[in-house]
């Protein structure tokens, strides 16, 4: 899975239903102050357009909540405990890297906003890197294309004539079909030949197996 690891999802902030989750770690003697800080930070984040949730469920321990929100892929987790409260700060954890830092409450929204941008950029870069690693462009011939699709799997970008017969031939021999037609610099150059039949290509197609 592109946006996942052994602990669950790693959702890009722009797609995540909750971009930030705040987990108060409160004992009876400081519970009111911690919940007040959580509410203030949440309000500041919402004012900047961040989708945030406070997980103040009393029936679950903090460790359970950490694991649950990691599984669901929430990009940033904020922890607020007694030490954070005393320091006038919160502890912020990135889902993608696990990096943890303490951030002062005044101006926390700006720091967390920058962190969300960094998470978005990091996940996008890793997704592009993974796609490139698993993509065969301009195979030397039809046999190489079929061997690649039958093997470890991935994507093949190759010129296509536009005929359904060619797509069906590839499907019969590799179970792969055309997933999309790129509209960028990878479009078929003038004079290119179809990878399947050798006829003039009309476009570049991306072939892959569906799962």
Residue ranges and their predicted role:
Residues 1-211:
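NTP/phosphate- and nucleic-acid-binding module
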């Amino acid at each position: 899975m592109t946006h996942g690891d052994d602990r669950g999802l790693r959702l890009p902030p722009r797609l995540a239903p909750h971009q930030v989750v705040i987990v108060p770690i409160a004992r009876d003697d400081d519970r009111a102050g911690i919940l007040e800080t959580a509410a203030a930070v949440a309000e500041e984040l919402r004012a900047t357009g961040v989708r945030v949730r406070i997980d103040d469920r009393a029936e679950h321990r903090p460790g359970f909540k950490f694991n649950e929100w990691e599984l669901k892929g929430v990009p940033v987790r904020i922890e607020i405990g007694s030490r954070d409260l005393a320091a006038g700060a919160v502890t912020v954890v990135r889902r993608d890297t696990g990096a943890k830092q303490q951030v002062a409450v005044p101006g926390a929204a700006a720091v967390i906003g920058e962190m969300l941008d960094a998470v978005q950029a990091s996940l996008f870069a890793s997704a592009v890197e993974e796609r490139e690693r698993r993509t065969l462009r301009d195979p030397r011939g039809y046999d190489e294309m079929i061997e690649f699709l039958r093997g470890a799997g991935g994507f093949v970008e190759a010129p296509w004539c536009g005929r359904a017969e060619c797509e069906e031939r590839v499907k019969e021999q590799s179970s792969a079909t055309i997933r999309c037609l790129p509209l960028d610099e990878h479009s078929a150059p003038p004079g290119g030949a179809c990878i399947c039949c050798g006829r003039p290509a009309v476009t570049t197609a991306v072939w892959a197996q569906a799962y």
